[in-house]
């Protein structure tokens, strides 16, 4: 599976690992937050290096649906159920700031994007009630939303809420431009460097897979913070969702707005212009990472829905993305606990990273260079509601229960031996010499790795859509060979009989 955005000849080539070992700021992660932060700091005259464990945009940003919208499904009414209107308005102002900065930047740089009307639609009476709540909160928060009964979709819609003047982007073209701009201001971007730890002394020692560096400031711009200070992995629920690009049947009429359902399962829709005509992009059908019996089934349901309503459309790409939802629904950002004010981070964008991610980059940069926006101050000083605290308790109780159940279950599975060869495209978990092991077969290659996540030891589950090992506790993911892909883990999986790889 490869996203429409990543399926291309990339114009980006990684910088060589620098000889210089000290920087003003080391940015960890080359997605939208990390790259905007690196650009703003480089422009200020700082010496900045970006370390990316995989490739630029390889994780969330390169797998997004690319919507830059202030109309975000049921997000605002959910926030209002936990916070004052002042806090909800601050969230909206943050997203306005992120959206405005990115749209202005793309216009200045000549990067194409399309302005579109964003539409949240309901297909049930219950969904209609939720939509009316969202409309009321949206208006209270200053958004000029309005209702429509003709959403232009090829299926029945009870009601639709619209917000004009939003945008859709090609996320990798955005990152390409940011990368060129960072380098033009003296910044360095190095792929294939996995940051594993950050010290607490000043200057801070940054331990990586390629050696140690030091920095006055470190920015963690990863999906989930890779440091356990603050225990944010206990406050975040990892979600995987699915997307596909389809070429519509010749002559068919495809709606041009950006759509999102308020009913479950979530269904998202937009177009993408190409030389051969518009592609239709659909998404949704998500689940908690690592906990679906068959992730492929979720993807198949999405494709079935798209083909039902757009008959004759040809699938060109399918992919998946991982996002993190905070238990209190508000993104976490700012100074990491026990980081002496020198480690900053952002996480919990809950599928709205194009606006939230840029907003967090603006706030982090202000923290480093001096100053802060009113919206950031309001969000930082919010009080977690009883509802948010209860959700955190539920999340962690469920995680502990899952770990206990999985450890008991693995002992009843068939034993793993050197002769265990799963069917093509499948993976199995069992005991190998008394320890949990995971064996998979992908493209004829059989691989055995530890079935214990390198983060906190969760028992991994096989992802039959992406052919990966996923942790059901906090969302870390690994290749069949045990190489780290994403999540709070900082090391590859152990190989039975060899220890850490």
Residue ranges and their predicted role:
Residues 198-271:
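Flavin-dependent oxidoreductases
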Residues 165, 263-264, 292-301, 308-395, ...:
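C-terminal catalytic lobe of FAD-dependent flavoproteins
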């Amino acid at each position: 599976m490869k996203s429409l955005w990543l399926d291309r000849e990339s114009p980006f080539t990684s910088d060589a690992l620098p000889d210089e070992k000290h920087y003003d700021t080391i940015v960890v992660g080359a997605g939208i937050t990390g790259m905007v932060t690196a650009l703003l700091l480089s422009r200020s005259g700082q010496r900045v290096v970006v370390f990316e464990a995989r490739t630029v945009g390889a994780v969330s940003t390169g797998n997004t649906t690319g919507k830059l919208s202030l109309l975000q499904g049921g997000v605002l009414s959910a926030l209002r159920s936990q916070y004052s209107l002042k806090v909800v308005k601050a969230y909206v102002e943050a997203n306005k700031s992120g959206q405005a900065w990115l749209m202005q930047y793309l216009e200045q740089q000549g990067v194409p994007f399309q302005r579109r009307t964003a539409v949240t639609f309901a297909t049930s009476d219950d969904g209609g009630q939720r939509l009316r709540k969202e409309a009321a909160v949206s208006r209270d928060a200053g958004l000029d939303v309005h209702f429509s009964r003709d959403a232009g979709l090829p299926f029945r819609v009870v009601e639709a809420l619209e917000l004009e003047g939003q945008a859709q982007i090609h996320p990798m073209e955005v990152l390409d431009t940011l990368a060129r701009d960072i380098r033009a201001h003296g910044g360095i971007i190095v792929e294939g460097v996995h940051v594993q730890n950050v010290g607490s002394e000043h200057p801070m020692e940054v331990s990586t897979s390629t050696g140690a560096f030091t920095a006055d400031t470190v920015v963690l711009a990863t999906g989930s913070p890779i440091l356990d200070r603050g225990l944010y992995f206990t406050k975040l629920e990892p979600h995987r969702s699915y997307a596909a690009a389809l070429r519509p049947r010749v002559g068919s009429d495809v709606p041009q707005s950006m759509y999102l359902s308020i009913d479950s399962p979530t269904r998202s829709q937009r177009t993408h212009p190409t030389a051969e005509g518009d592609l239709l992009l659909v998404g949704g059908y998500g689940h908690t990472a690592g906990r679906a019996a068959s992730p492929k089934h979720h993807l198949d349901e999405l494709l079935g829905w798209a083909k039902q309503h757009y008959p004759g459309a040809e699938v060109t790409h399918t992919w998946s993305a991982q996002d993190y939802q905070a238990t209190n629904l508000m993104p976490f950002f700012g100074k990491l606990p026990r980081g002496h004010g020198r480690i900053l981070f952002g996480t919990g964008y809950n599928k709205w990273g194009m606006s939230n991610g840029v907003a967090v980059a603006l706030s982090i940069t202000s923290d480093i260079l001096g100053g802060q926006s009113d919206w950031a101050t309001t969000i930082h000083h919010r009080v977690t509601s009883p509802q948010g605290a209860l959700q955190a308790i539920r999340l962690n109780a469920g995680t502990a229960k899952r770990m206990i159940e999985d450890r008991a279950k693995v002992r009843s599975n068939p034993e793993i031996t050197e002769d265990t060869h799963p069917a093509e495209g499948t993976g199995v978990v069992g005991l190998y010499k008394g320890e949990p092991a995971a064996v998979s077969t992908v493209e004829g290659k059989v691989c055995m790795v530890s079935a214990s996540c390198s983060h906190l030891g969760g028992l991994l589950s096989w992802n039959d859509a992406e052919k990966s090992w996923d942790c059901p506790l906090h969302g870390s993911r690994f290749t069949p060979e045990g190489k780290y892909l994403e999540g709070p883990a900082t090391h590859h999986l152990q190989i039975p009989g060899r220890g850490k790889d």
